[in-house]
């Protein structure tokens, strides 16, 4: 009750800063308890300057602080789920599509120095301070809400892209430390937190990210169960007495396999995501190929009576493609399936404590000088129509080479060295 005596002017002044997702937390408390005080508090943190333009379906993002917006829209999504406020749903969907279509880099991340910028100048913002991790963390959260409403496979496509290219590569595999930004500056490198001196916002969300890999693999409704991600896992659908075990080495391999355990024969539909990045998918049930009539960017629906021991195999061919920036066709990311590839560029000029943050400097992740050597080669010559001709895959790992001697690997797998996307 303490905020109630405050004037509307004071309320608006108080919430002008970045307060994160506290209103979402109050909506969740309202859902748990039914106490209207929590709903009132959630609505009290409604940020007019952020949400009102979105209610009008207007992109007024300008150069504002990116992560000030996203958690507040997540709260609106939660509001819709609890109150069926259609305005909250429409603005949430509008914001998501605006972000993905106009404000997102190839790895699925957004922002430059934490802020929006003119989407018509995206190629001019490939800096060492792109891709704040908190932004992607919250976009994935918003995506989970929207997918539950729509079942739209494009949402799952984005989720996979951001999960593999940004989140998976955000953590240093040697120390467990995490990165604030995902630098897209040619010749830069990832800059990690330290064990005792860094506690940025992206450390908090960064560690939470890596406990969430199981959150968005499977979804279900009255029609059936949806397989959105190709990650080794097991899910049990208690109401159906059905357990599905997924085994795969994706993305190192193109095939994923499912084994079903059924207490009793059960008729339902299993929806396998048909990603937009693949074509000519091959699916078999118990060793027999089935006809795939769906197109990429949808779901392959398999409806039948499932029995204990049934098996499904799905192979998703991956191709080398280019993802060009909207404002400059000569700047593009090299893609392999959903993965953004990057070229190794060694460690020249990297001096300790790099690639870790310098605790002696204030917010050095935000002012860091990457000291990119002037002679470092930052481009790759290839045929735009046939980029696959420039690369040769080496062995079973996701490693490619070029005639110029470049070594190219997934961006998520490049650590402790410079790279070029």
What are these regions (language model features)?
Residues 16-37, 66-104, 115-273, 282:
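Aromatic (Trp/Tyr) and acidic
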Residues 1-16:
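Asp-box/WD-like beta-propeller blade repeats and closely related beta-sheet repeat scaffolds
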Residues 280-287:
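Short, surface-exposed beta-strand/strand-loop-strand elements in extracellular ectodomains
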Residues 50-65:
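A surface-exposed regulatory interaction patch that couples sensing to output
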Residues 92, 156-165, 170-261, 285, ...:
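C-terminal beta-rich recognition modules with glycine/proline-rich loops and embedded aromatic residues
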Residues 299-301:
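Short, surface-exposed beta-strand/beta-hairpin micro-motifs centered on an aromatic residue
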């Amino acid at each position: 009750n303490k905020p109630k005596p405050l004037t509307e002017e004071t309320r608006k002044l108080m919430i002008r800063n970045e307060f994160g997702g506290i209103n979402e937390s109050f909506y969740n408390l309202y859902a748990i308890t039914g106490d209207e005080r929590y709903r009132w508090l959630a609505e009290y943190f409604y940020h007019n300057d952020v949400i009102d333009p979105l209610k009008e379906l207007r992109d007024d993002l300008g150069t504002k602080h990116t992560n000030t917006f996203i958690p507040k829209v997540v709260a609106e999504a939660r509001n819709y789920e609890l109150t069926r406020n259609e305005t909250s749903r429409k603005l949430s969907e509008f914001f998501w599509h605006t972000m993905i279509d106009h404000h997102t880099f190839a790895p699925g991340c957004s922002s430059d120095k934490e802020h929006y910028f003119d989407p018509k100048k995206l190629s001019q913002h490939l800096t060492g301070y792109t891709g704040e991790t908190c932004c992607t963390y919250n976009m994935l959260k918003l995506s989970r809400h929207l997918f539950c409403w729509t079942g739209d496979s494009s949402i799952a496509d984005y989720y996979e892209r951001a999960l593999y290219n940004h989140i998976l590569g955000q953590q240093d595999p040697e120390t467990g430390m995490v990165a604030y930004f995902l630098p897209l500056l040619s010749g830069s490198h990832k800059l990690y937190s330290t064990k005792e001196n860094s506690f940025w916002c992206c450390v908090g969300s960064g560690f939470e990210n890596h406990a969430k890999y199981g959150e968005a693999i499977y979804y279900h409704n009255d029609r059936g169960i949806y397989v959105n991600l190709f990650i080794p896992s097991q899910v049990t659908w208690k109401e159906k007495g059905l357990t599905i075990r997924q085994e795969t080495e994706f993305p190192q391999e193109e095939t994923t396999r499912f084994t079903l355990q059924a207490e009793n024969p059960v008729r339902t539909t299993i929806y396998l995501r048909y990603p937009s990045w693949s074509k000519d998918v091959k699916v078999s049930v118990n060793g027999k190929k089935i006809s795939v009539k769906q197109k990429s960017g949808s779901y392959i629906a398999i409806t039948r009576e499932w029995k204990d021991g049934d098996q499904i195999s799905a192979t998703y061919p991956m191709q080398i493609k280019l993802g060009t920036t909207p404002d400059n066709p000569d700047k593009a990311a090299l893609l392999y399936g959903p993965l953004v590839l990057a070229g190794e560029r060694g460690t020249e000029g990297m001096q300790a404590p790099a690639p870790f943050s310098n605790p002696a400097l204030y917010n050095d992740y935000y002012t860091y000088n990457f000291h990119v050597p002037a002679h470092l080669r930052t481009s790759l010559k290839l045929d735009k129509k046939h980029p696959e001709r420039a690369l040769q895959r080496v062995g079973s790992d996701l490693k490619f080479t070029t005639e110029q001697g470049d070594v190219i690997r997934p961006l998520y797998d490049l650590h402790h060295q410079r790279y070029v996307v």
